[in-house]
């Protein structure tokens, strides 16, 4: 059986909007998730739509080096560089996790020149929920 040829104006062939829209974003939210193994920095607008993100792994760090403060600093600087070109001037910071990259990422964000409204720690804390895993014996 012969394959059907799609129409030129069909919905599947037409791209509705360009993916990399450069829109002006004056204010945003910077989410820093710092685990012991990696640090992920996500920048969203105030409605929660992701504008830019970066992690220590995407910046070229592999293995245990991803959990270092320097890797977190590099990831934060990499994510902020793209949004500062789009005109972001003010931001709120949400920091989550116990990792080493918390302070280093915050230091890199402060140095970038973006004005910070507030810094909030949103690390989830259990109110005696699930039993925690047993301690490692090395």
Swiss-Prot record:
GO terms for molecular function: rRNA binding; structural constituent of ribosome. Keywords: Chloroplast, Plastid, Ribonucleoprotein, Ribosomal protein, RNA-binding, rRNA-binding. Its main location: plastid. InterPro entries: Ribosomal_uS11, Ribosomal_uS11_bac-type, Ribosomal_uS11_CS, Ribosomal_uS11_sf. GO terms for cellular component: chloroplast; ribonucleoprotein complex; ribosome. It is found in: Plastid, Chloroplast. Part of the 30S ribosomal subunit. Belongs to the universal ribosomal protein uS11 family. This is Small ribosomal subunit protein uS11c. The lineage of its organism: Eukaryota, Viridiplantae, Streptophyta, Embryophyta, Tracheophyta.
